[in-house]
Structure formats: C-alpha cells, structure tokens
Amino acid sequence: MRSAMNPKDTLFSAPIDKIGDFTFDERVAEVFPDMIQRSVPGYSNIISAIGMLAERFVKPHSKIYDLGCSLGAATLSMRRHIKQEGCQIIAVDNSAAMVERCKLHLNAYRSDTPVQVIEADIRDIAIENASVVVLNFTLQFLAPDDRYALLEKIYAGLRPGGILILSEKFVFSDQEAHELLIDLHHDFKRANGYSELEISQKRSAIENVMRPDSIQTHKQRFATLGFSSFEVWFQCFNFGSMFAIK
C-alpha cells in the first residue's frame, strides 16, 4: 500500500499540450521514490549494494561523496554500512526541492557518520581525501562535454584504492539489441502500472536532458583516467552500475 509519504507518480498521466524538458522540481521530488522504483529496473538492488561496496572500500578519516544525491537513498544505504571512524558523507544535488527533502529523510535516522547536504552543481564541488564516490544515475544528465572533466576531478580526489560507483542508463551499438532492451524497459514500466501515454510523454520530456553513454564509452574513460580496475557489476535491461577502483 502506498503511503502519504510516497505518493504515486501521476505527472504524465494526463495529456500535455506542450511537453517541456524534464526537471527535478518540487513536483518530481514529491513523487520521486515511486517514480524511480517503477521506472528503473533493479534500483533497490543497486542502492543496497552501494552500501555494501561502501562498507568494503571506505577508509577511516576519509570522505564519501554522493554526487547527485536526490533524496539521499544511496547516502542512507552507505551510512547504514559505514563502521569506520572519522568519516563524513558529502551529499550534493543542484535541485533545491531534492535537497530539502533529502535533509528530512536523513534527519529521520540517527547515525554516527555525519552527512553534509549541499545544494550545488556537482561540477563545482571539490573532491578530496575520498575513499568512495557515488554517481547514481547522475552523469547521464550532465552535458557530454563536461563528463570527462568531472571524472578526472573525481579520480584526482580519490585515495589510492578508492572506488567510484557509477550507475547509468546505457545505449548499445548493436541496434537490434538496443531496441530490444528499450522494449523490455517499457514492458517493465507497463508491468509497474504506467500507461502508454505516461511512457510516451515521459520519454519526450527526458530525451533532451538525459543522454546516456555506452558501456564501452565509460570503460574507455576509466582506462584513460588510469583506474586500475573497472567493470559492470549490475545490469538489468539497459540500466546498470559500474565500479572503477583507483
């Protein structure tokens, strides 16, 4: 049963005359937990595993960054798993609506690991003394020309042995496979109660602001930057998550 705390996403359920670009505004922030669960295959698994990966890679007296934190799901997962002393999580999002709700979510749970929630462009954040950096479905919303520079800054700010966790929607060079995975994703959304109108209108709204890369493109960037190990650790249809270890 859906609670009042997690209202149903009906943002695209009625016909919209002029569909504008998708933005992470108050309307989206309000329904985001329902939207993300019903739209992103494997989202709960990714969030849970981010906590487990953080537990394995976090170092005492280091910083953990959640860049594009939205409502703080990855931050909460990591905070539950961190046992090391002197750590701090820095959660960043450029949406004021997301940041305010993120603070409320985090304040509902007690933890020994402090979290600083910052409203800012992740490209403007200094990365330093980091043992874990998370980009959970965030990089795909940056301008393509800005992606390498951000990853370069993350690499420079990671401690040796530190990990970058990158979750993204993927595109595929094999057109038949690419179209099949898109169709399966739409089947997933239909199975979760989205109508054809909702799927079509959401796709129109988001196609100009979310520009996914291929797995090969991500791996080429990691190799160029100098990461010692990188791989896809989770994939469901055209969504997945990768790690890159410095």
From Swiss-Prot:
Print the keywords alphabetically.
S-adenosyl-L-methionine, Transferase
List, in alphabetical order, the GO biological process terms annotated in this UniProt record: tRNA wobble uridine modification
- Matching Pfam families: Methyltransf_25
Q: Which cysteines are joined by disulfide bonds?
A: none
E.C. no: 2.1.3.-
Q: Which residues bind S-adenosyl-L-methionine?
A: Y43, G68, C69, S70, D93, N94, D121, I122, N136, R203
Entry keyword annotation includes Zinc: no
Q: Does the keyword rRNA processing apply?
A: no
Q: What chemistry does it catalyse, as a reaction equation?
A: prephenate + S-adenosyl-L-methionine = carboxy-S-adenosyl-L-methionine + 3-phenylpyruvate + H2O
Domain of life of the organism encoding this protein: Bacteria
Give the molecular function GO annotations: carboxyl- or carbamoyltransferase activity; S-adenosyl-L-methionine binding
What the protein does? Answer: Catalyzes the conversion of S-adenosyl-L-methionine (SAM) to carboxy-S-adenosyl-L-methionine (Cx-SAM).
Q: How does it assemble?
A: Homodimer.
Can you tell me which family this protein belongs to? Belongs to the class I-like SAM-binding methyltransferase superfamily. Cx-SAM synthase family.
* UniProt name for this protein: Carboxy-S-adenosyl-L-methionine synthase
Provide the species name. Vibrio cholerae serotype O1 (strain ATCC 39315 / El Tor Inaba N16961)
Gene that codes for this? Answer: cmoA
